[in-house]
Design a protein with these regions (language model features):
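Amphipathic interfacial helices
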Residues: 3-324
């Protein structure tokens, strides 16, 4: 095949592949435009950081109706005292508001379709509910994450001062490493809020995302437990505080509601409805994407699943279950 024809074929195949990816991401952006899905991303932090969550909701609501407010909120973060630290260290828990020219893997997965010059992304840009929802999503998550990050860095500077003044001594002072603590906490924010580190998987992220598989979110969910055993004691403490509040608070509300007869709660981890609220034929999952991994592990370890409709046990195929 002549080189010119070969290049034309490669270009056509590439364009067809991009159109398929764009179509999937277009559908996803529309689905994400009619709920408060950024709450799901922040779920592990909400109960232990209620003031930050309230402030983030206010910012998100204002950004929904005002592009100018959303842009100002982003600029306020970029002009704050710790943003240079954030940028130079290469942290990535903040989502870009304007996505044009931003690599696909850095964009918010729910709205990855925005920011390109191809036909489908251009159409998405013209849909007001997609644009408004993307602004609200990005502003809400960024506001909450930045508040938590700056408060932690402030705390680390205070620890550093106390060590310098001799108020903290012994092993705690000997093991002190401020950069390690901040790096570790930034990674924790990323993992727990759906910004898992992709590494060599960056190239395939857009394609998987088009198939409704959020690679960064799922990697973050899978990596979350590592922070409970982090080498840095300050990050480890924050991980335990936030995850205990998350699991304990959500479980308590669910079981209380069940006792009051408001809803039913499935307690068999082999069931896909495990620890979901069931009321009036509807299901509500407050776990932000974590529950499914408990179910998968339970099914893989027991070799059995339980039907969410009939309650009957059935044998499972390991590869099929892991794929779900």
């Amino acid at each position: 095949m002549p080189l010119e024809h070969r290049n034309m074929l490669v270009s056509a195949l590439r364009e067809a592949g991009l159109n398929a990816i764009d179509a999937g991401n277009f559908m996803r952006a529309n689905l994400a435009s009619f709920d408060m899905s950024w709450w799901r991303q922040q779920a592990p932090f909400i109960l232990n950081n209620k003031r930050d969550f309230i402030a983030a909701n206010i910012a998100s609501w204002k950004a929904l109706w005002s592009r100018g407010f959303a842009q100002a909120a982003e600029q306020r973060i970029k002009q704050s005292r710790y943003y240079q630290l954030y940028a130079e260290a290469g942290y990535d828990f903040l989502r870009p508001l304007e996505q044009k020219g931003v690599p696909l893997w850095r964009r918010e997965e729910q709205f990855m379709v925005l920011g390109s010059d191809r036909p489908i992304p251009k159409l998405a840009e013209k849909l007001p509910w997609v644009r408004l929802s993307q602004r609200a999503f990005v502003t809400g998550t960024n506001e909450m994450n930045w508040r938590m990050f700056t408060r932690f860095v402030d705390k680390m500077y205070k620890v550093n001062e106390r060590i310098a003044m001799g108020k903290i001594t012994g092993k705690q002072a000997a093991d002190w490493n401020m950069k390690r603590s901040i790096d570790s906490f930034a990674r924790m924010i990323g993992d727990l809020t759906g910004r898992g580190e992709l590494g060599p998987l960056k190239a395939i992220s857009p394609g998987l995302n088009a198939g409704f598989f959020s690679l960064r979110t799922n990697l973050g969910r899978i990596l979350t437990p590592r922070h409970l055993f982090a080498a840095d004691p300050y990050t480890r403490k924050e991980a335990w505080k936030n995850l205990l509040a998350f699991v304990g608070g959500v479980t308590g509300v669910m079981l209380l509601g069940e006792q009051l007869g408001l809803w039913d709660v499935e307690k068999d981890p082999r069931n896909s409805d495990f620890m979901k609220i069931r009321a009036g034929g509807k299901r509500f999952d407050p776990w932000g994407g974590y529950q499914q991994y408990v179910t998968v592990i339970s099914r893989l370890t027991t070799g059995e699943g339980v039907s969410a409709t009939t309650g009957q046990e059935y044998p499972i195929q390991p590869f099929q279950t892991a794929g779900r």
